[in-house]
Amino acid sequence: MGDEDKRITYEDSEPSTGMNYTPSMHQEAQEETVMKLKGIDANEPTEGSILLKSSEKKLQETPTEANHVQRLRQMLACPPHGLLDRVITNVTIIVLLWAVVWSITGSECLPGGNLFGIIILFYCAIIGGKLLGLIKLPTLPPLPSLLGMLLAGFLIRNIPVINDNVQIKHKWSSSLRSIALSIILVRAGLGLDSKALKKLKGVCVRLSMGPCIVEACTSALLAHYLLGLPWQWGFILGFVLGAVSPAVVVPSMLLLQGGGYGVEKGVPTLLMAAGSFDDILAITGFNTCLGIAFSTGSTVFNVLRGVLEVVIGVATGSVLGFFIQYFPSRDQDKLVCKRTFLVLGLSVLAVFSSVHFGFPGSGGLCTLVMAFLAGMGWTSEKAEVEKIIAVAWDIFQPLLFGLIGAEVSIASLRPETVGLCVATVGIAVLIRILTTFLMVCFAGFNLKEKIFISFAWLPKATVQAAIGSVALDTARSHGEKQLEDYGMDVLTVAFLSILITAPIGSLLIGLLGPRLLQKVEHQNKDEEVQGETSVQV
């Protein structure tokens, strides 16, 4: 009987919480009961539990300490690896590049020399882009690195000690920017998707043409009455501002598309496709107005000359485009390299020779048409060419934005001019947002999607940097002070538009996208949901 009194019984019924007892839970309950019978508190640590916890703690700490020791050994290893190896390699490449150029050119690569200025600007622009890329905000897309490149060039120009030693001749600066413009135009032409244009049709045309033309006209009106520019220069400024920046819009759209936002209605696809056509329209309008502005004679003659430049550009681009569709033929060796060399070489030749022959507006249009037709003929094979051209763009992008920033001098800017330029940009952007909202009405989008598209169509960067200085370079070639002042006003507005709209546009896309766009729900891990474009024409 005494043994029966000491016996401990347990009920096999489930607890009232609905949870099932597992064998481990049953064992823990037995141990707790035994400790209570012995007069030991269950919460009081025993000697065994203390030893067990200390051993577990040592096991947890040992791998961490081992990782730190291993990392330290890797950093101090001989030969070095990891971060230290990358730093030494990059510094060696930087010094070697300067040393090779110095051994060939001598004083040109010393402080105050032209090549020295280009190399330092190139290095600083890359560093500026990398530093800005380190600024990462949660749930937001990264700030565009081109903004850091722009600010790097601006600081080089406006810090007296650096500016005295970093000097770049206008001829070199203009030529490098023109080469960068050629690369941008080739990428835009090859990037045009005829299938996307057929699918999106009406709304794509409205979105690419409406806001660009309305903003260009608004900017021309403001530039004429606020900045005192002639009408021709006003429209030059208008088409500089009229383009949206693929460098800001496309990465942000890819992030949203990867998260499933707006895919069902095809919002990212629409914006990426319409962006290329928007840029082409702005560049074509700019080149036409540029040819008219630097023509002599009556207004009718200037308009006809502008039309003639468009015809020459389209005709020449068509001939060259069909030529490089078939030459080189597909059976040749190193086909991709030959195609890349031809399309880049012909585009640079078109941009420079058009200025030489007195038709500056035809070169850019010729390049666009040529690249578009070549891409249509190459079909899927153009992707390999685009990869090589993307590498060329990675080299010239720091030069382009760094040189644009270096053209703006604080000493030469008047406060009232800066204020008027900011007002011009602000009013033009506001009109663009309203116009974009109207253009996507009756296209199958709800109110939130219309608001998002309106703000996503805001950023400016690449095209403004590419063509913003062309008018100034052309004016310098004519040697007229008044025209140079007009060109400087255009460049200042382009600089401010990049500085203001690129970061704001990127942040707005990142903030508004997840809140305003519908997200596609993935029911199964193996199920891929592809966004079908359901846009009413």
From Swiss-Prot:
Tissue specificity remark: Widely expressed. High levels detected in the distal tubules of the kidney nephron. Detected in red blood cells (at protein level).
One GO CC term, this protein: recycling endosome membrane
Phenotype for residue 47 to A/K: Decreases Na(+) Li(+)/H(+) antiporter activity
Modified residues (Phosphoserine): 49
Gene Ontology process terms (BP): clathrin-dependent endocytosis; flagellated sperm motility; inorganic cation transmembrane transport; lithium ion transport; monoatomic ion transmembrane transport; positive regulation of osteoclast development; regulation of insulin secretion involved in cellular response to glucose stimulus; sodium ion homeostasis
Disulphide bridges: none
Phenotype upon changing residue 406 to E: Does not affect plasma membrane localization. Decreases Na(+) Li(+)/H(+) antiporter activity
Membrane topology: Multi-pass membrane protein
Additional notes on this entry: The subcellular localization of SLC9B2 remains controversial. Was initially thought to partially localize to mitochondria. However SLC9B2 does not seem to contain a mitochondrial targeting sequence. It was later established that its localizes predominantly in plasma membrane or intracellularly to endosomes and lysosomes. In another recent study, endogenous SLC9B2 in the distal tubular cell line mpkDCT4 is detected in recycling endosomes but absent in plasma membrane.
Name listed for the protein in its UniProt record: Sodium/hydrogen exchanger 9B2
Organism from which the protein derives: Homo sapiens (Human)
Primary gene name: SLC9B2
